[in-house]
Amino acid sequence: MGSSAGSWRRLEDSEREETDSEPQAPRLDSRSVLWKNAVGFWILGLCNNFSYVVMLSAAHDILKQEQASGNQSHVEPGPTPTPHNSSSRFDCNSISTAAVLLADILPTLVIKLLAPLGLHLLPYSPRVLVSGVCSAGSFVLVAFSQSVGLSLCGVVLASISSGLGEVTFLSLTAFYPSAVISWWSSGTGGAGLLGSLSYLGLTQAGLSPQHTLLSMLGIPVLLLASYFLLLTSPEPLDPGGENEAETAARQPLIGTETPESKPGASWDLSLQERWTVFKGLLWYIIPLVLVYFAEYFINQGLFELLFFRNTSLSHAQQYRWYQMLYQAGVFASRSSLQCCRIRFTWVLALLQCLNLALLLADVCLNFLPSIYLIFIIILYEGLLGGAAYVNTFHNIALETSDKHREFAMEAACISDTLGISLSGVLALPLHDFLCHLP
């Protein structure tokens, strides 16, 4: 690991010399720092993705505003079904929920495309502040909106918050032990589960969408507190956080690694070097793009059309349950890195594409007899998506040099966002086509 590893060893040696009379103190302090950073990154992952997830869970309610006087109407918790579109066998909104997906992802795509070119010039603290303010603004704007257009502007704020935060915090992991990537990923999975479950639970209990969204304003405050008050300075830590076995097993994505390379120097990379690193990342980027394309095509293109009339759940309630079960699967698999590591993530891409084919066929042919079968498939879909995310970034962290890791993490962020954006673009015309079928 070069000079950074050597400086870490010298720091350990000096600590041992200074504390011979109390040999356990430095070790306990080190453990305390590691746990603070681990918990800090888990909370950051949770808070960063929370508004993004809530907006997708609320997508059906946001679009129903075209058929109601704003979103402040009370949500009926009971089983009374909603009126159906008489012109189609699907109970369709006039606009696909993919419209909310696009508003929730396109600003993130722009941020991630531009991030590797110059975002590193802006210090981390202002980025985190902007992310927190945008998150709070999204909840307030959607809560008080009286139109779909204004609500979508609030969704855009959530997208800016999530996209800027993800690029920022994943880049920041380059300065901490590699284990924090697992904690970050678990936190983002927790955001999916807690975000969708909280929206489902509060609306199911009878709370209006407006009050449900306003009750979540503490999340941006928690994000800022975690970054400014909980995380410790990364300087004393080995940025890669690897043991000797991990270092020896590393297979650099490019062949120009030098023993003196260290994280934090990505601003000094030439365009040619950035392009070389990016080409090496394609082995991981392409499978993750496919995974996210397939799962979000399902989530925002097909969920609304996988409607069962012979259940006690209304259409809106079915949609919220789909979102919650998907996020439960994501949380479980994003938290599984210590138990199961997958190097060949293209296998996950293949399985997710098979999920898409199965559910698209069911939308067209209506051959799955029970909503509970759909529940199982959606849970499995979430497991595949979460596993692809955490293993992709873990593999990149292990297989990039210290000098290139910060840039590599920023560049790889484009994978999920690109797949999601493509799925939203294709899901919109599919929705219109299917909803006009008799």
Swiss-Prot record:
Keyword annotations: Cytoplasmic vesicle, Endosome, Glycoprotein, Golgi apparatus, Lipoprotein, Lysosome, Membrane, Methylation, Phosphoprotein, Prenylation, Synapse, Synaptosome, Transmembrane, Transmembrane helix, Transport
Lumenal-facing ranges: 59-127, 173-182, 299-346
Protein induction: Expression is osmoregulated in renal medullary cells.
Residue numbers of Phosphoserine PTMs: S14
Annotated protein name in UniProt: Battenin
Transmembrane segments: 38-58, 128-148, 152-172, 183-203, 278-298, 347-367
Lipid-binding residues (covalent, S-farnesyl cysteine): C435
Cytoplasmic-side positions: 1-37, 149-151, 204-277, 368-438
The keyword Plastid is annotated on this UniProt entry: no
Mod. after translation: Highly glycosylated. Farnesylation is important for trafficking to lysosomes.
Motif Lysosomal targeting motif. Required for AP1G1, AP2A2 and AP3D1 interaction, chain ranges: 253-254
Motif (Lysosomal targeting motif): 242-244, 409-419
Main location: membrane
Domain of life: Eukaryota
Effect of disrupting the coding gene: Embryos are viable and fertile and by 12 months of age do not exhibit obvious clinical signs but have significantly shortened life spans. Mice show elevation of lysosomal enzymes in brain and accumulation of autofluorescent storage material in neurons, retina and other cell types that increases with age. They also show neuropathological abnormalities with loss of certain cortical interneurons and hypertrophy of many interneuron populations in the hippocampus.
Residues modified as Cysteine methyl ester: C435
Gene name as annotated: Cln3
Xref: InterPro entries: Battenin_disease_Cln3, Battenin_disease_Cln3_subgr, MFS_trans_sf
Membrane disposition: Multi-pass membrane protein
One of the record's GO cellular component terms: early endosome
Propeptide segment residues: 436-438
Compartment(s): Lysosome membrane; Late endosome; Lysosome; Membrane raft
